[in-house]
């Protein structure tokens, strides 16, 4: 099980402050305090399918339930900040408006987060946080039926 092998389990998720596509300022994990939250993080456009594979099933199962939250966090190097309006505009056009509040694009020092979480930026990553922002599950790349079951089971246990 992930709890036995992953050093991130039990750690507080590092703070990310950024603007959502709905143009609200969000600070993760604080913006979701009191909720069980899936945070899906990607550093490459090519990882989008991986995030969708985690977020889609989670949102389908928990998205309308009270006490749950989810965020998709594209992490973009500060060097692309000058393209922010074009990048965010493209994402807004391609993502349904009701999902905009859940997409929080961070422009900045991405290496800070890859080091803090000891993750490989070539993959998308899914972090399930408890109500206090502590990491209780972590997945990388595409999920399989077993990892989705573990994610769901962990979320349901946290909800009790």
Where are these regions (language model features)?
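Solvent-exposed loop/turn segments at secondary-structure junctions
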Residues: 45-47, 76-80, 110, 135, ...
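N-proximal helix/coil linker or "cap" segments that precede and/or mark the start of modular domains
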Residues: 1-14
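A short beta-strand-turn-helix
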Residues: 16-36
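Loop/turn elements at helix/coil->beta-strand transitions in domains of secreted/extracellular proteins
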Residues: 34-36, 66-69, 124, 131-132
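Structural microenvironment flanking redox-active thiols in thiol-disulfide oxidoreductases
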Residues: 46-96
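Thiol-/selenol-based redox modules, centered on thioredoxin-like
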Residues: 115, 121-160
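Thioredoxin-like thiol-disulfide oxidoreductase module
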Residues: 79-122
